[in-house]
From Swiss-Prot:
Pathway: Isoprenoid biosynthesis; isopentenyl diphosphate biosynthesis via DXP pathway; isopentenyl diphosphate from 1-deoxy-D-xylulose 5-phosphate: step 1/6. It catalyses: 2-C-methyl-D-erythritol 4-phosphate + NADP(+) = 1-deoxy-D-xylulose 5-phosphate + NADPH + H(+). Homodimer. InterPro entries: DXP_reductoisomerase, DXP_reductoisomerase_C, DXP_reductoisomerase_N, DXPR_C, DXPR_C_sf, NAD(P)-bd_dom_sf. This is 1-deoxy-D-xylulose 5-phosphate reductoisomerase. GO terms for molecular function: 1-deoxy-D-xylulose-5-phosphate reductoisomerase activity; manganese ion binding; NADPH binding. Mn(2+) binds at residues 150, 152, 231. Its cofactor is Mg(2+); Mn(2+). NADPH binds at residues 10-13, 36-38, 124, 126, 215. Keywords: Isoprene biosynthesis, Manganese, Metal-binding, NADP, Oxidoreductase. Its EC number is 1.1.1.267. GO terms for biological process: isopentenyl diphosphate biosynthetic process, methylerythritol 4-phosphate pathway involved in terpenoid biosynthetic process. It comes from Escherichia coli O157:H7. Belongs to the DXR family.
Length: 398
């Protein structure tokens, strides 16, 4: 029986994680749930899964949760704040920590889990995009086990040999017979839109993803392929891959979630329905397998599987992310922060779709790129980049 803390339990990944627990009550027990401000959903989760602890981001939400749980006779202890979240990630009897708090808020609790030597099911993109070196160093020092939840990185992980799986971020790909990692992406809803029309695309059009059901921010990131750029950065850290060992491919059907190319000419791929419960269940049960609740892939209903190289004129954000990695952690942190501001501005109809990449580049050019030495340095770069990005948005929108 694996004991589990879920950081970000009321979000999409958190709810999917609890669904896997629901399908496998004999394998997993929820010890602690950590969330932001969604008290209603947290009440439902506490009543169903009876965790020992529940943590809310702020005191007001925690007070409300405590009152509602007491009325229902729940014995779950309610806490609040970031330190409590970090404590839940490092609880002595917890085996696994699902790190699914979105954004910079997830950094310190995830790092607490790493330092406590836990098995970390990593769904928080920012951990590696902004703190890649810091996090991988901490993993090595504490002998924690990282298991990637993101569907692409999980597909790569499943397609890699065991010596690499057990030494993520440090194993030598070439020594293990790996030539390259092929990161696949759908290309988003504007894959075939004429380039001249991209400037007129609306937020609603950008959010109509052909295959995956996602939130609005990540849907826009899929349309710009910034999500693939961030995944490229994560993959470089996770798999200790050089630029020449990485390939990015457009795969419109989203059936092959990523591949690994070997020296003998073999290519191993992981296929499946586009459902996050598959990679979540894989990381939770690794090295075993459990029922995820996902329907089997029906090969007879599949159309052709097609692939193409990405066009950087269509996807300048992808190129920006690849170049930012070469500049270092300050650049990847600044790019991630700027992109959050520019995407929010696009969703608020303050800027055009094509302005996202232009403003992201502008922020990178204006930033002082000293390498961060600790998480506080990273948060400082993040805050500065957001401020520059806001000014750039206001300049363009006025």
């Amino acid at each position: 029986m694996k004991q589990l803390t879920i950081l970000g339990s009321t979000g999409s990944i958190g709810c999917s994680t609890l669904d896997v627990v629901r399908h496998n009550p004999e394998h997993f027990r929820v010890v602690a749930l950590v969330a932001g401000k969604n008290v209603t959903r947290m009440v439902e989760q506490c009543l169903e899964f009876s965790p020992r602890y529940a943590v809310m981001d702020d005191e007001a939400s925690a007070k409300l949760l405590k009152t509602m749980l007491q009325q229902q006779g729940s014995r779950t202890e309610v806490l609040s704040g970031q330190q409590a979240a970090c404590d839940m990630a490092a609880l002595e009897d917890v085996d696994q920590v699902m790190a699914a708090i979105v954004g910079a808020a997830g950094l310190l609790p995830t790092l607490a889990a790493i330092r406590a030597g836990k098995t970390i099911l990593l769904a928080n993109k920012e951990s590696l995009v902004t703190c890649g070196r810091l996090f991988m160093d901490a993993v090595k020092q504490s002998k924690a086990q990282l298991l990637p939840v993101d569907s692409e990185h999980n597909a790569i992980f499943q397609s890699l040999p065991q010596p690499i799986q057990h030494n993520l971020g440090y194993a030598d790909l070439e020594q293990n017979g790996v030539v390259s990692i092929l990161l696949t992406g759908s290309g988003g809803p504007f894959r075939e839109t004429p380039l001249r029309d991209l400037a007129t695309m609306t937020p609603d059009q950008a959010c109509r993803h052909p295959n995956w059901s996602m939130g609005r921010k990540i849907s826009v990131d899929s349309a710009t392929m910034m999500n693939k750029g961030l995944e490229y950065i994560e993959a470089r850290w996770l798999f200790n891959a050089s630029a020449s060992q990485m390939e990015v491919l457009i795969h419109p059907q989203s059936v092959i979630h990523s591949m690994v190319r070997y020296q003998d000419g073999s290519v191993l791929a992981q296929l499946g329905e586009p459902d996050m419960r598959t990679p979540i269940a894989h990381t939770m049960a690794w090295p075993n397998r459990v029922n995820s609740g996902v329907k089997p892939l029906d090969f007879c209903k599949l159309s052709a599987l097609t692939f193409a190289a990405p066009d950087y004129d269509r996807y300048p954000c992808l190129k920006l992310a690849m170049e930012a990695f070469e500049q270092g952690q300050a650049a990847t942190t600044a790019l991630n922060a700027a992109n959050e501001i520019t995407v929010a501005a696009f969703l608020a109809q303050q800027i055009r779709f094509t302005d996202i990449a232009a403003l992201n580049l502008s922020v990178l050019e204006k930033m002082d790129m000293r390498e961060p030495q600790c998480v506080d340095d990273v948060l400082s770069v993040d805050a500065s980049a957001r401020e520059v990005a806001r000014k750039e948005v206001m300049r363009l929108a006025s």
